[in-house]
């Protein structure tokens, strides 16, 4: 009796050898558990015939789960080109795909994909249900990565959360943008915007084409030349360009020339924010010239007043408002320049083209007699483009949407600490600002 009890205790501790029958039972239980684990991962992956989970290996040291998938030989094969039935030629070398993590363990899928022998298309690597052709990630991982990158404050933060490198993230975004551009519908475009954005140091620019109604970037090209502008418009079909009714743009000659050639039926609308910028720069030139003259006489009246002349008085503090009011009463040249700028803002409120023309004529006459050269130069430029200023009264569009997207693009550039490659810059802009359908099917 005591011998039986000791043997049972030893068996529980695993300190004695067991017989063939016990070893067989243990192996059977292990095989049963492996089978259940394989079924479990097959369900998680959505894998079914003719594919099956062959093995699941847990690598604790590497913190990885490795899943091997296999093709059930004898199953019907299809050509990836035409979808027709065909025979199996051979198997391609083993490939690995990154999948969603399992309990914080990196999960990898391994498989040798069969290659089909099609009478029409020859030998082709067959498509797999868990990943796109030539992809290095499963469809589920790519979808997750897109969500994380869009939600993260920066790409580097998204990379850290997913445990991937910058180049991997860039590749995921590139593939997502390619998918999005292929699916994008551009019918019904009406109001577009064109604007420039600095790319690198010096005179290096990119040109953006934006859909003002949908607040999205349609495409980006390098430089701001006529050729670059034509390249942008070439992304639209003749029918899409014909539907465009107006384009908001500044007074950059290559942009105007290209719009007139590519979309002759659309009105050019010179953006009121750019006009305000030109007038603001003229006011600042007058201030700097007058400040220099006053300082030569020992007068520091305009010292430290730059922001007061450029910013909206509605946002002034009580102290700033009092200081600005006192400066305006001193009959300074810069005060007259500022008054000309503020007066022109009334132009945009007119509903009648005739009354707007009359206002501009009066404003232009007053400015011409002001003897303020920087303001006069801007007034003459506005007169040359008056017809395209008046189109605002018809369409009421501005490049405010484009400017808002420019701010977002600037934040992308700052987060990346600049871009050496325009290709990567374009992918990043379209990924975050293109409103594309980025997800894999």
Residue ranges and their predicted role:
Residues 2, 14, 21-31, 83-86, ...:
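Short, positively charged, Gly/Tyr-enriched micro-motifs
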Residues 29-66, 71-74, 140, 161-246, ...:
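Long C-terminal interaction/binding lobes of large macromolecular proteins
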Residues 72-76, 111-114:
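Short metal-coordination and nucleic-acid-contact micro-motifs, chiefly zinc-binding Cys/His arrays
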Residues 128-132, 242, 266, 290-295:
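Short, polar/flexible loop-turn hinges at active-site or ligand-entry regions and domain interfaces
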């Amino acid at each position: 009796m005591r011998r039986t009890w000791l043997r049972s205790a030893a068996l529980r501790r695993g300190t004695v050898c067991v017989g063939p029958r016990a070893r067989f039972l243990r192996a059977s239980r292990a095989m049963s558990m492996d089978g259940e684990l394989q079924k479990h991962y097959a369900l998680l992956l959505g894998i079914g015939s003719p594919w099956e989970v062959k093995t699941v290996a847990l690598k604790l040291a590497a913190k990885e789960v490795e899943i091997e998938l296999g093709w059930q030989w004898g199953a019907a094969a299809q050509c990836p080109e035409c979808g027709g039935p065909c025979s199996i030629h051979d198997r391609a070398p083993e490939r690995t795909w990154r999948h969603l993590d399992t309990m914080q363990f990196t999960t990898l899928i391994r498989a040798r994909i069969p290659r089909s022998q099609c009478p029409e298309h020859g030998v082709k690597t067959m498509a797999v249900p868990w990943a796109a052709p030539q992809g290095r990630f499963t469809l589920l991982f790519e979808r997750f990565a897109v969500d994380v990158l869009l939600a993260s404050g920066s790409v580097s933060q998204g990379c850290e959360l997913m445990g991937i490198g910058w180049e991997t993230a860039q590749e995921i975004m590139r593939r997502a943008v390619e998918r999005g551009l292929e699916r994008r519908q551009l019918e019904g475009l009406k109001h577009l915007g064109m604007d420039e954005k600095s790319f690198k140091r010096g005179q290096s620019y990119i040109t953006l084409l934006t859909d003002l109604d949908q607040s999205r970037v349609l495409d980006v090209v390098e430089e701001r030349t006529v050729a670059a502008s034509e390249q942008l418009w070439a992304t639209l079909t003749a029918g899409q360009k014909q539907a465009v009714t107006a384009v908001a743009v500044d007074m950059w000659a290559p942009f105007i020339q290209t719009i007139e050639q590519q979309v002759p039926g659309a009105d050019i609308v010179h953006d009121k924010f750019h006009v305000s910028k030109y007038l603001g720069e003229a006011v600042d030139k007058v201030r700097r010239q007058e400040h220099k003259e006053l300082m030569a006489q020992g007068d520091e009246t305009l010292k430290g007043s730059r922001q007061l002349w450029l910013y909206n008085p509605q946002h002034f503090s009580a102290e700033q408002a009092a200081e600005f009011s006192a400066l305006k009463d001193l009959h300074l040249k810069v005060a007259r320049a500022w008054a000309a700028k503020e007066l022109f803002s009334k132009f945009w409120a007119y509903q009648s083209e005739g009354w707007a023309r009359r206002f501009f004529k009066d404003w232009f006459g007053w400015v011409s007699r002001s003897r303020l050269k920087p303001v006069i130069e801007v007034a003459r430029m506005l007169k040359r483009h008056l017809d395209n200023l008046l189109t605002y009264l018809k369409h009421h569009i501005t490049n405010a949407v484009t400017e808002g997207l420019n701010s977002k693009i600037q934040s992308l550039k700052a987060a990346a600490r600049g871009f050496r490659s325009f290709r990567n810059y374009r992918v990043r802009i379209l990924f975050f600002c293109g409103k594309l359908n980025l997800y894999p099917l």
